[in-house]
Amino acid sequence: MLSIRFDRDREWWVPGRVFERLFQTALENGQLGTDLGEWQHVADANGGVSLVDIEPAVARALTIGLRAAASAELVRLGDVDQHTDDGTYKASLEKLLMLSHDL
């Protein structure tokens, strides 16, 4: 599990494989710039990342990119069995969007 902290009050606990899948999708679809690719490794190596503690412009770009990718992925996934890998992925994406809706 990784901890992605958006601010002092909001933290997204996400399975590492879900974060990797979303992050790679965001990179591949241009929702995250390639210059942000290192943050996937930073989060993986450190058990997460606190967006509060990094450069605000980088934190904003990561939040916007991951939210855009999550929204697109939810549309693509449609209705999936919650007991599958896609179901876990979908539930995690929905939680990301809920936690970061007003950032």
Regions found by a protein language model. Give the residues of each.
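Acidic (Asp/Glu-rich) sequence patches and key acidic residues
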Residues: 1-103
